[in-house]
Amino acid sequence: MHMIMTAEAQIKDYLELLSSKAPVPGGGGASALAGALGDSLGQMVVHLTLGKKRYAQAEQDMLNYERELKRLQQEFLMLADKDAEVFAPLAECYRLPSSTEEEKAYKEKVMEERLVQASYVPLEIMEKAAEMLGILKELAEKGSVMAVSDVGVGVQFARTAIL
């Protein structure tokens, strides 16, 4: 099984692994990466807004958004790898024997436990994406009007991370 550090991966290598038969990365990691991409667009809008006279009244807000978005981006990348960590043991369950009733019962029990464990990371990704949506809403209202379409794309990435 290939493990990949999402933050360190080349885009091409990550996409190749994502499109392979390997169980990880998968949808959870991809949704976290979508969150990180949307976050990056939010940071871009902040940087396009900072230092502009027209947006001087929003300078402190922009600095706060920048700090929060940097934190969220790191969390998205960490969650992409964490998703692979918690999904790998679940994927191994499919290889457990299930010839006898005892084996079937054991496999079912272990799969249920690992499914529960694996479900927490996607929930965290959704929570972070929802938090990011709040910041993106503020950026749409207070950020550079020249970058409002970038905020819109960031919102779509956040929605992808939630779905």
Go through the PLM ranges and name each one.
Residues S20-L41, A147-I162:
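Conserved phosphate/anionic-ligand binding catalytic regions in large, soluble enzymes, centered on
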Residues T6-V24:
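Short, hydrophobic/aliphatic alpha-helical segments
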Residues L15-L18, A34, L41, V45, ...:
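Short alpha-helical scaffolding segments that buttress acidic/His motifs in well-ordered protein cores
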Residues M1-I4:
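Short, Lys/Arg-enriched N-terminal segments with co-localized hydrophobic residues
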Residues M44-A56:
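Transmembrane signal-anchor/signal-peptide helices with a preference for the extracytoplasmic
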Residues K53-E92:
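A structural-propensity feature for long, helix-poor, extended segments
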Residues D83, F87-Q156, T160:
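Amphipathic alpha-helical interface segments
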Residues L33-L37, Y65, L72-L79, A118-K128, ...:
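Amphipathic alpha-helix face/heptad-repeat signature
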